[in-house]
Amino acid sequence: MSSLVTQIDLDKINHSQSTVKDYILLMKPRVMSLVMFTGFVGMWLAPYSVHPFIAVIVLACISLGAGSAGAINMWYDRDIDSLMKRTQKRPLVRGAIEPDEALSFGLITGFFAVFFMALCVNLLASFLLLFTIFYYICIYTIWLKRRSIQNIVIGGVSGALPPVIGYAAVSNTISLESIILFLIIFIWTPPHSWALALFCNDDYKNCKVPMMPTVKGILYTKEQILIYSILLFLVSLMPFFIGMNNFIYLIIAGMLGLVFLYYSGSLFYDTPDNKQAKRLFAYSIFYLFFIFLLLSSTSTISNIS
C-alpha cells in the first residue's frame, strides 16, 4: 500500500514539474533572456543611478511582459504551429496546456508586469511595456504575420523596444541614445529572421505565412538581407560618433559588422542544405548579444550604482 502511495506521489511531482516546464516554455524563455539582457543594457546606459532592487523589478517586469506576449502569441498561433516542424513541440500543440489556460496566463502575467512597472518604477516605462505587449500581439501576431511580407520588418518594433524601456525606467525619458539601441535591434531583426526563413522555407509554405522567401523568392530575400546588413553595420557605429561609446567600441563593433556582412554576402553562394543561412542565423544571435555587451562595457556614460 505504501509503495502505491509513493508511486502516486511521485507521479504528482513529475506532473507538476512537467507543468511548470511547459509554462516556462510557453513564455519563450530564449526570447525572454535576450529581451532581459537588452533591457539591462538600456538601464546601464542611462545617465542616472538606480537602486539595485528597482533594477531587479524593471528586469522582472520586462521579462514577464515578454513572456506574456509570447504566451498569447502561442495561443493565437497554435493552428499554424502544429504545421511547422520547428514549432510542433510547443506546449499547446502537444496538448500540455489548454488554450484557455494559456490565454489567461498570458493576460494575467502581462497585467502584473505593467502594473508593477507603473507602481514601482514610472509611468513612461509602464506605458512603453504595455505598448510593446500590445504591438507584438495585435500588430504583429494578429494583423501582420499572416498578411504581409513586411511582417518581420514592421513587427520588429516590439522586439526593439526593451532597451528603450530599460533606459526610460532609469531616466524617465526617451533619448537619442535609447533610440539608437532601438534602431540596432530593429534593423538586425530582418536579416536574422529571414535567415531563419531561408532554411525553414517549407514550414512557412505549409502554414501559408507570407515570409519573404515564400513570396518574393530566395534571391530577392538574400538581396534584402544584404541591404539590411549594410544598414546594420552603419547604425551599429553610431554610438561612437555621438559620444556614447569609446574608440574600442568602434573597432570591435566594426569588426563584428564586417563578419555579419561576410555571412550575408556568402548567402549568394549557399548550398542546397542552406548551410550559410544557418551560419548567418547563428552568428546573428551571437552578434546582437556581443554588440550589447560591448555597448555596456565601453560606455562613456556613468550608470547604475
UniProtKB/Swiss-Prot annotation:
Q: What family does the database annotate?
A: Belongs to the UbiA prenyltransferase family. Protoheme IX farnesyltransferase subfamily.
User: What is the name of the protein in this document?
Assistant: Protoheme IX farnesyltransferase
Cellular localisation: Cell inner membrane
Query: Which Pfam families does the annotation name?
Result: UbiA
**Which reactions appear under catalytic activity for this entry?**
heme b + (2E,6E)-farnesyl diphosphate + H2O = Fe(II)-heme o + diphosphate
Its Gene Ontology biological processes?
heme O biosynthetic process
Provide the E.C. number(s) assigned to this enzyme.
2.5.1.141
Pathway per the UniProt entry: Porphyrin-containing compound metabolism; heme O biosynthesis; heme O from protoheme: step 1/1
Q: What is the stated purpose of this protein?
A: Converts heme B (protoheme IX) to heme O by substitution of the vinyl group on carbon 2 of heme B porphyrin ring with a hydroxyethyl farnesyl side group.
